[in-house]
Each structure stands twice: as structure tokens, then as C-alpha cells.
Amino acid sequence: MSEKPFPIPDDVPTESPSAVHDRLVSDERFGVLDTRAPADVDDWRIDGDGVAFANVPYYEFLDGVPEDALAELPDARPLYTVCAKGLSSKYVADVLGDAGVDDVVAVEDGMEGWETVLEATELSADTDAAVVQFHRPSSGCLSYLIVDGDEALVVDPLHAFADEYVDAAAERGADLVAAVDTHVHADHVSGVRTLARDHGVRAVVPAAAAERGVDYAVDYDTVADGGTLTVGETVVEAVHTPGHTSGMTSYLVDDAVLLTGDGLFVESVARPDLEGGADGAPDAARRLYDTLHERILPLPDDTLVAPGHASDAAERADDGSFTDRLGYLAESMPALDRDREAFVEFVLDDMPPRPDNYEAIIATNLGDRRVDDEGVAELERGPNNCAATTDAMTEG
């Protein structure tokens, strides 16, 4: 349902999405009143352990504040109102304030503003290089900046934040020299081409992913299994880890940090159906099993796994990042202890809906489809569902 015309007050207290995110990360308790239609809220909302959440559509407030709506309001304060663009939420905040509800604050720009939040956390890792994890809370997407001396490389950059990676490298006294993807993404538009086009950064695509027919308007290099990229004095090794996609490639930094893309998460394993569909999923799941047991799990237990996504079920490490030691994941994730066919059955039985617009996003990332910034935002709106399950597979 589109938002109907109503007065938009200009004196309602507001707070930036970044400030709301900071409160969320601190586990401070607060309330969220989402004024979008229920169908828009079910799969994509601001949520967390400290959030008391309610959904009452804005149109319920067009004639004042109904008693049943008051009864549904979270008791936690502040109470943030949020909508799609920051319009109806201001109206509702104003109406609630007039009705005597205290400490109501509208989230600036609504969920569109929430999409612009990017959180940076430097990993506590046994590497000479600094490895910085970037987290987009609106989708759970994770990207990484590797900085050694005056050079930096970014892995799995998002188009929407291309300039931020360049700035982050500069803040650390480095030039961003290369951008590389782990695979052809299905949930967000890659920033590799954007960085090459706008900032002269070297574009790199996994050789196995390029075989799907990557057709960029900019020149790009490929890196094959066992090949290396260098950042300053740091060596980054490409490790072909198919399963989620045929071209899925992880990157081992200083033999200590494994950037697993969408192959292995800290709370789950990858879904296998986004490239070959339902018909190809069983064979892809078998490839994923082989990858996990032949290419990833044999690495040292203290290898730090740094994935490409974090779901709501993911827990933060002590340094605030979404990472974990490989040995812990091997012990705590029952899926990794199953035999091959039991693993395949388990993965195929528990998959969430495919990401919104995933076919159009794949086409865009292959270079078959062109979209502007507004089109990118529309394609990416909503949750990612690249994991095999929305629930944690880990125990403990």
C-alpha cells in the first residue's frame, strides 16, 4: 500500500539510522514501531536482542490513535517510528506525541536510510595486514578491506558503498589498488566494476566465476585456484570453494584469515540453488559438502573464518566482528558432522525463500543488465537469503 497524503510535521524529534544502529549494537533496550504495511515488514525490519518491536500501519492513525494501537505499542523507550522513506513515521510520531506518548523519535529517511548504514570493525587477527570487516545491517552483507602499508584491497565490495571503501583506505594511509569478488552475487550489486570505472582500481574476478560469462564494460583480471594477490607484503591466496555457486572462491589472508564469501558462515552453510535452481541444487549441495570437507575443514583450527553474510542469528565475536575460529565451527555446527547424503538432505530441506530480485541481480553482476543507482537500491531492498537456513546451525 502506498502512503496517502497527510501532513508531515517538521518539528518531530528524529534520529539518524546510524545512531539507531549504534544503540542496537550496544544491546540497549528500545522500541521500534514500524508503520509500513505488514507484508513489507514480515521479512525486513529493524530488529535485535534489545528491540521491542511492533507493527501498526500508518493508516491506522489517520483518524487519531485507536485504543488497540496504543495497547500494541512497545513499552521500551525511546520508541522509534520507522516507515519506508521517513514520511509516515514522522506523522505517526507526531500523532502519538499529541496523544501523550512520551519519547517518540522518527528514524530519518526510514528504511531507505537504514540501507545506507555501514559499520566498520577491524578484526583481531594474526596477520601483518589490517583486515577490516564492513557490515551492512539492512541486509547482513559483509565486505573486507585488507590494508598493508600504502596499499589496500577490497573483497566483495558493494556498489552502494564504493566511495566508502576508497575513503576507508585513505584514512589508513593507503590507496585502494584492487577490488575482487568471491563469486557472482545474487543478493547485491557488486562494486568491483564501479571501483574500476570511477577510481581506476584493478578489477579482479575469480576465474571459475568468469566462466559463467562475465561481460564487464571495464577490463578485469582473473585469479584461479591457488593463485595469489598481493597487498603490500601480504599474500592473499585464492581457494576455489564451489557449492553455493560453481565459481565460489575464498581468499586466505596471511594463512590466517579465510574470507569464505557465501560458502561457510559463522551460523550456517550456504544454500546451493541460486545458480542451477532446484534441479541443480542436489549436485551443488554435494559439491558444497566436498568443498567443506576437502578444502576448508582441513585448514588449521585457529583459522579465522570471515564470511560474506551475517544473519540475525549470527553472534558477534569479542572484537565486535562476525567471525569465528574454524575449529569452533567444526565442533558446534552439526551440519558439518553429517555424512554426505545426510548433509545434502539437511541443506535442501531447510532453505528459506530465494533473495528478492536475485535473477536480475545475477544478470547485473554478469554484465548482462545495466542499472543506475536508484535501480540498484530497488534491486537490493530487503533481506538476503544466501544461507541454507535463517536459523543458526551452531550449538552453544
Regions found by a protein language model. Give the residues of each.
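Metallo-beta-lactamase
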Residues: 152, 160, 174-177, 211, ...
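Cysteine-dependent PTP/DSP-like catalytic domain, specifically the C-terminal lobe
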Residues: 106-124
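Conserved beta-strand hairpin/beta-sheet module of binuclear metal-dependent hydrolase folds
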Residues: 37, 123-171, 251-261, 266-267
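Catalytic cysteine-centered active loop of the rhodanese-like fold, especially the PTP/DSP P-loop
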Residues: 56, 64-112
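Active-site HxH/HxHxD metal-binding segment of metal-dependent hydrolases
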Residues: 60, 116, 159-234
